[in-house]
Amino acid sequence: KKTDASRVYGIEFEHMLSPRNLNFLVNHASLVEEHIAGIPGDIFIQDYLPKCSEVQKAQIAKEYVKFNERCMIRLLGDMRSYNYVVIPIHDFDQVIYKIRAIDFDQQSYEGKFSVYRPQFFKENRAMMDIVRAKLKTDSITQYKIEERSTISRRLIISDERMKLLLAIMKDDTVSLKENVISLKKEIFRFTNENSFLDCKSMGDLMEKTLKYLKRNYQNVSLIDLI
């Protein structure tokens, strides 16, 4: 693939913050990334989801809550159903499902916060339907806290690498100035955290977001999934 800033930052954040590492190589204008095997989300929703058992649908709903939370926290945009895969894992007498992003070129670019929340894309409506059908509010809260806790632990593990990446990103022009201004205002409205208003770049926003997460990962009342 052709190298661009958003995609490289997106892959770096995926490698450090997601449950699974992602191997990749950048050489000048070329980018080689590890293939992520799985069923494209749009195909899964159309051909596989209707055939899943009720237990499997509940497990998929749980994974989707965590995936949605992960994308929102790390500002990975445009996660429509064709930009992620659903991975079936056979475990003795059952099949469990994991969800992973496969397209990272909308990392920290758009100015609308909703773009970083997969739940709002019409292509993902079927996933949101099973979340509403299968999970109670308390369960959604629990899974959001679990995901935030996991990301916080991964931040500690990758502390030095993350600091270096954010230092570079803060000095880089990843997006348009008006997108930064719009996004920081929207995030401020959700968090009431004044420090977001001081951000001058998408790198600043990512740094403030991750610091805010580590301080407040148990506070899920700010943003509702349903």
Where would I find each of the regions flagged by the language model?
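AlphaC helix of the protein kinase catalytic domain
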Residues: 43-50
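Short, low-complexity, polar/charged sequence segments that are solvent-exposed and flexible
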Residues: 17-21, 51-55, 118-123
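Short C-terminal domain-edge/linker segments immediately following a structured domain
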Residues: 29-34, 63-64, 129-138
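C-terminal catalytic region of ATP-dependent kinase domains
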Residues: 93-226
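Conserved kinase catalytic-core segment
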Residues: 51-113
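Hydrophobic, Leu/Ile/Phe/Ala-enriched alpha-helical segments that form helix-helix packing faces
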Residues: 17-18, 68-72, 187, 213, ...
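Conserved ATP-binding subdomain of kinase catalytic cores across diverse folds
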Residues: 1-42
